[in-house]
Structures are given as structure tokens and as C-alpha cells.
């Protein structure tokens, strides 16, 4: 399994629409950087957020998630409360090849501010916007800048094609758009 370089990422984005919209340059002046890098792609966070709240005294249950757990927010800067959590989505829409797995890691700019980003792997055959989990581990409110970089995606190409892709198994988050809350298939 090999880590893919910028030339491969560019080709897959431009010829196979693996990343849309695709930013061929790495933009970093005056913003949290985003776009193509040497061995990855820095994704941007959109303007929509779901911020966790305790206003309704609910319990977070991944098997029975309720909308009352979150407050919707849209804007250029999202303030994540101290020791709190928010969901967001990428601006980019991904179409993963059947022999490629992507791993996403948080950006050091945010990590050095106590903001941890978690994104689960993009499985072979997955298609959709990526839901981003943002955790503010500090005792202070933290700013997240929409339309700027939030994490870096690394693409790993398998030595052979898997038997069953995410699309084949009709994954529960396949073709998701916007921020997708937890789902349990019944």
C-alpha cells in the first residue's frame, strides 16, 4: 500500500473528479492553509456547523441521536464553547476510487490551539461530503474559520482491489451531503 503524491492526487481530481471543488495550489497566506500539498490534500471546512449544547438536558446516544443535542449555526467564524464539540462538513465532495483508502489528520495550526479534529477513514468506493468532528479541549472558547483549512487527507492505494467497497455494501453514509448526524441501520 503506497502513499500517493501530489501529481497522482491532481490527476485523480481533474480527470476522475475525486475531489470537487479542487484547489491545485496550496493557499496559506493569511488563512489556515488548504489545497494540494506534496503528499496530501488540505480540506476546507464549510460554513454550516452543529454545536453540541446541554440546553435541553439530553443525553448523547449514538444509537438514538436526537437533534436537540445540537444547535445549528451558519457563518464565517464558528465559536466552539470551552470543552465542547461541534460537527461540520467539508466544502469538498469526494469520490474515492475502489482501491484507495484515505486517512484524515488534523492541522497543526488548530492542534496547537487545543482544537482536535477527528474524521474517520474514507473507504474505497465512498462518495460524499465529509462530516468533520471538532473538539475544543481548552477551557476557553475557540474560533473555527469557515472556508479555510481544517485537516489534511492522505491517500493510500492498495496493492490489490478489495472484494467489497463502501458503495457495494451500501454504506449508511454513502452520498451524504451537508453535515450527517450519527445513523444506526435498523
From Swiss-Prot:
Binding site residues for dCTP: 107-112, 152, 166, 176
InterPro entries: dCTP_deaminase (IPR011962), dUTPase-like_sf (IPR036157), dUTPase_trimeric (IPR033704)
One of the GO BP terms on file: dUMP biosynthetic process
Enzyme class: hydrolase
Keywords: Hydrolase, Nucleotide metabolism, Nucleotide-binding
GO MF annotation: an example: nucleotide binding
EC numbers on record: 3.5.4.13
NCBIfam families: dCTP_deam (TIGR02274)
PANTHER family documented for this protein: DCTP DEAMINASE
Oligomer status and interactors: Homotrimer.
Function according to Swiss-Prot or TrEMBL: Catalyzes the deamination of dCTP to dUTP.
UniProt protein name: dCTP deaminase
Species for this entry: Campylobacter jejuni subsp. jejuni serotype O:2 (strain ATCC 700819 / NCTC 11168)
Amino acid at each position: 500500500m503506497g502513499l500517493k503524491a501530489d501529481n497522482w492526487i491532481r490527476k485523480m481530481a481533474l480527470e476522475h473528479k475525486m475531489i470537487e471543488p479542487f484547489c491545485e495550489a496550496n493557499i496559506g497566506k493569511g488563512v489556515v492553509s488548504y489545497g494540494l500539498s506534496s503528499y496530501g490534500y488540505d480540506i476546507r471546512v464549510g460554513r454550516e456547523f452543529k454545536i453540541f449544547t446541554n440546553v435541553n438536558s439530553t443525553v448523547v446516544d449514538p444509537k438514538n441521536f436526537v437533534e436537540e443535542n445540537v444547535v445549528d449555526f451558519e457563518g464565517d467564524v464558528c465559536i466552539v464553547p470551552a470543552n465542547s464539540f461541534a460537527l461540520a462538513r467539508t466544502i469538498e465532495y469526494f469520490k474515492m476510487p475502489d482501491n484507495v483508502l484515505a486517512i484524515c489528520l488534523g492541522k497543526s495550526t488548530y492542534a496547537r490551539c487545543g482544537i482536535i479534529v477527528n474524521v474517520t477513514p474514507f473507504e474505497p468506493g465512498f462518495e460524499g461530503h465529509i462530516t468533520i468532528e471538532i473538539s475544543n479541549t481548552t477551557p476557553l472558547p475557540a474560533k473555527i474559520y469557515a472556508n479555510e483549512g481544517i485537516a489534511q487527507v492522505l491517500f493510500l492505494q492498495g496493492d490489490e482491489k478489495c472484494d467489497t467497497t463502501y458503495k457495494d455494501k451500501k454504506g449508511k453514509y454513502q452520498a451524504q451531503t451537508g453535515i450527517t448526524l450519527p445513523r444506526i441501520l435498523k
